[in-house]
Amino acid sequence: MDNDYLIKKPPLQALFLFSLPMIIGNLFQQTYTMVDSAIVGRYVSEQALAAVGASYALTNIFICVAIGGGIGASVIVSRYFGAKEYGRMKTAVFTALLSFLGISLVLGVAGLFLGNQIMIWLNTPQDCLDMAAQYLRIYFLGLPFLFMYNVLSAMFNALGKSRIPLYFLIFSSVFNVVLDIIMVTKMDMGVAGVAWATLIAQGISAVLSFAVLIKNLNGLEGKQKTLFDTMELSEMTRIAIPSILQQSTVSIGMMLVQSVVNGFGSEALAGFSAAMRIESICVVPMSAIGNAVSSYTAQNIGAQQKDRVVQGLHAASKMVIICAAVICFFLEVFNRGMIGLFIGNEGTAVALSTGIGYLTFMGWFFCFIGFKMAVDGLLRGAGDMKMFTVANLVNLGIRVIIAITCAPRFGIAMVWCAVPVGWFANWAISYAEYRTGKWKTM
């Protein structure tokens, strides 16, 4: 397939072909994190599942920083690629890699010192606090690998080669699951085994991805003037910061909301954590569609084909509707079996009812996050970041305020009632900005 199919093929076909490898790859990524939780929940204890879940909200913020930063950098790289300015594109790629390597090292060191205290601030139940802190310490050691893998994947996506990260992710996922089984069920390492398995698998994937990216860049004409350009970094930062906010909105909100859930005890936290793992899989196709729209928009603007951008959003909306219908069916019909994968027959009634209640309610509202991510992807790809950022902050604010003010009084169900309200508000603001047409002049 030609690398420039995003600017040549019909919009629906182009978006489908581009997003499909990302969907498959992200499903593998989420599947092995789900396996992490399922293994500790079934083979260690319900408290171990709660510990990994308590850590998940914080660790997912770092994942979102890496993904959001990669998306911001990929917009610039996509524009240069669409305009066939390969020399500037290579400079942008290396600037992104060096920048995020430095950021990951700083965050990793900070996390080693502050991770345990953050778990305390988040009101983590005492019976799983030590395990959560142990998991975090190992996780922060592998933060550079996490950042580099996600940024490298974004670079491949910007070049229209979204299949390459998929191949490495499949390898990493399978290897991670094998290590999980060995370290937890055979070596009895508990939550530490899960953390080490993730670190090793991501490290290997990052190194291999870097080697293949260099080979692909060497095959393109044009030579970069320097390995690091502050002007390119400035432009990437302008787009990356709102992208990071957008990617982190869910996770920051989840972390703050989880502090409320933690107050209901480790049993409720275990059920909530299981539901979060399943929700993360359900969000994958919506996120991939949004990321595909972002690269599609950036390349078509770079190729002076803005009329195709509008067609692309319409095509993405059709994809969202289909995905949302499938997700709703599975969550409404199979919610009990899904939660049972993590908790098993020995799980407490509180854990089971919490997880099932969340999935049953949320199944009806995934169209909101899909529409939100599609229009957000267009604005991000066009560089229209102001209202994009406002919309995502409103989303975060609504979710946190409703959960913190209403859950203690009306029960834990208010935690998930707040989620679709935030999604809808985010979409409404972003769509209104899209309708103004300002994105065409960015």
Predicted segments, located by residue:
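Transmembrane alpha-helix boundary and packing residues in multipass membrane permease domains
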Residues: M22, N26, A38, V75, ...
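Transmembrane helical elements of multi-pass membrane transporters/channels
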Residues: L17-D36, I138, S172, A201-S205, ...
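Short alpha-helical transmembrane segments in multi-pass integral membrane proteins
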Residues: M1-S19, V77-G142, K186-I241, T297-W364, ...
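Short runs within selected transmembrane alpha-helices of multi-pass transporters and secretion channels
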Residues: G70, Y139-N157, P165-S173, V194-V207, ...
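N-terminal transmembrane alpha-helices
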Residues: I7-V44, A57-G72, I76, L101-G108, ...
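Hydrophobic transmembrane alpha-helices of multi-pass small-molecule transporters
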Residues: I61-C64, N176-D180, A206-F210, I281-V284, ...
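Helix-terminus/linker motif at the lipid-water interface of multi-pass membrane proteins
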Residues: T31-L49, M119-Q126, I182-M189, S248-R277, ...
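Small-residue-rich hydrophobic transmembrane alpha-helices
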Residues: L49-V109, L146-P165, G271-F329, V333-N335, ...
